[in-house]
Amino acid sequence: MKIGIINTKIRTVFSAFACMIAASLVCTMPARAVVEININKGVIEPLPIAITDFLSADQLGSNITSVIAADLERSGLFAPIDKGAFIEKISNPDAAPRFEDWKVINAQALVTGRITKQPDGRLKAEFHLWDTFGGQQMIGQQFFTTPDNWRRVAHIIADAIYERLTGDKGYFDTRVVFVDESGPAQKRVKRLAIMDQDGANVRFISDGRALSLTPRFSPNRQEVTYMSFEGGSPKVYLLQLETGQRELVGNFPGMTIAPRFSPDGQKVVMSLLQDDGSANIYTMDLRNRTTTRLTSSQAIDTGASYSPDGSQIVFTSDRGGRPQLYVMGADGSNPRRISMGDGSYSTPVWSPRGDLIAFTKQSQGQFSIGVMKTDGSGERLLTSGFHNEGPTWAPNGRVLMFFRKAAGAGGPKLFTIDLTGRNERQIQTPNFASDPAWSPLLE
């Protein structure tokens, strides 16, 4: 199944610059309005926003509205107003609303829209974002797509609203690959699955006959690398999401652990278990299948993750006694320890923004998800509990997804949390779920 579903172009004009999104667009926008969210503040008060049901001949308009509202509310930055409080009934979403009616209910922003079916069977989705207190339109767009892609349209609209009001890219039109876990604990079946970031449209991409772990997206969103125990020994595979075809990256004599793509998609970094019981970090060039050894310690070096520019790698090593975080050059040069707190650190992953590293920390019987600056300073624990593990970044670097197994629970579940640590949400999945990996924005 192709990830880049909506293949026509959208252009949204923002006062002084243009931004490309994936779909077809007509847009008008006046000068920047006053209403906005400063996401760099320590404590953020969610912005009251009114999202009216998109006009349509069937339930689809209301369904799209619900997805938009859920996306924005789940971010923790927006507070959708209950529709029962609305005074004005929108009959023409293209016309300026009665701003006073929306100011009365403290709606600082207003979304109106319409869904119509075209003669060729496609859907036309139109929406407008209004600054109610400034009395002006902030965005006006229209999109064309096939009916089965209506959820993507909703996510793209939510992304446009998020970006316009925060100044940051959204993260709603994305997918997550993860390990689905079903069956009793003693006979747990683990297979790879992919879903929208909100838990919708789950699709299994492995059959569960062999244990599959650590799935990771390629930068182009079209491939997933993962570890499979097919045949009894761990091997690293590349899976083409569109065709379902897969290929063996390498059949190494020892265990292969935690493969992950480089930012340019040309290499995979991973750990290989050595004969002496140590594990060292290697890269494989996918163009010619050559491997390069980056670490040569007698320790367990694993969990490697590239910086966004590809110049550095963060990894976990117990070379100092217990697992800690280290950063080295992409060629293995100048390894240096960056974690200095009590406890053990693992599963580091570099933020897409380049400013933070997320990690799992085990200390005093608790597993925590935390972040630190790339030099190890400013460590903050966002959530702690019986077992939290495996953070992965949203593509805008503002939200993390991870998995949690609560004490006494039958298996793990997926959760998201923002960088304030105050907005934690569970992602509903059909079964137990672990080891998520977030995709870049879709195209």
Curated annotation (Swiss-Prot):
Q: Name one GO cellular component term.
A: periplasmic space
**What species is this protein from?**
Brucella suis biovar 1 (strain 1330)
| Matching SUPFAM superfamilies | TolB, N-terminal domain, Tricorn protease N-terminal domain
Query: Any idea what this protein is called?
Result: Tol-Pal system protein TolB
Which coarse location class describes where this protein primarily resides?
periplasm
Its localization reads:
Periplasm
**What's this protein's family per the entry?**
Belongs to the TolB family.
Instruction: Read off the InterPro entries from this record.
Output: 6-blade_b-propeller_TolB-like, PD40, Tol-Pal_TolB, TolB_N
Give the superkingdom in one word: Bacteria
Q: Which residues form a coiled coil?
A: none
Record keywords: Cell cycle, Cell division, Periplasm, Signal
Question: What this chain does, per the record?
Answer: Part of the Tol-Pal system, which plays a role in outer membrane invagination during cell division and is important for maintaining outer membrane integrity.
* Signal sequence interval, chain numbering: 1-33
Q: How does it assemble?
A: The Tol-Pal system is composed of five core proteins: the inner membrane proteins TolA, TolQ and TolR, the periplasmic protein TolB and the outer membrane protein Pal. They form a network linking the inner and outer membranes and the peptidoglycan layer.
Which Gene Ontology BP terms does the record give? Answer: cell division; protein import
